[in-house]
Amino acid sequence: MNCPVPENQLPINEYNKLTSAWDFSWACKIGKLYYKFLLKMQLCLFLFFCICLNFLDSKYETGLYSLILSTLFICLICLRTYLGFRYIYVRLLKSALPYEESSWYDGQVWVKNINYLIKDRLVADYTVLPILSRLKISFTINFSFLICLLLRFIF
């Protein structure tokens, strides 16, 4: 039995599209490559903000401001990526998919057959869930660091 839901709306295809997108693919890196990429991104943002703040005025604590801004951006990037993968994770786990087309069958629901369901749940549990865990840890660490930097800035 073929799936009546359009190919681009199948959760597995949405997952494949998300992992190949340049702004989400970094989260799929494995182990040390993931953390190296995050550190490189943090360093590039830090240097960018240092240069920008130096052009504005030299009375600011450029290093601290740059670190706060780069950490804030990393938190926002992690949060955006987490929300994207979370959406896919929830769709992979669902046993029924709503149609998202604007035609006569809009709003109806297609129940996945057992083959689709097993395949989707395996991808969700063994591929997407570890990505979500890493993103959650990265966000927590960066957000904690951001709070410490803001406290240092205030006091």
Curated annotation (Swiss-Prot):
Claim: Chloroplast is one of the keywords in the record: yes
One cellular component term from this protein's GO annotations in UniProt: chloroplast
Location(s) in or outside the cell: Plastid, Chloroplast
Keywords: Chloroplast, Plastid
InterPro entries found in the cross-reference section: CGLD27-like (IPR009631)
Main location: plastid
Protein biosynthesis found in the keyword field: no
Coiled-coil positions: none
Family: Belongs to the ycf36 family.
PANTHER family per the UniProt record, alphabetical: PROTEIN CONSERVED IN THE GREEN LINEAGE AND DIATOMS 27, CHLOROPLASTIC (PTHR34214:SF3), PTHR34214
Protein's name according to its UniProt entry: Uncharacterized protein ycf36
Species of the source: Guillardia theta (Cryptophyte)
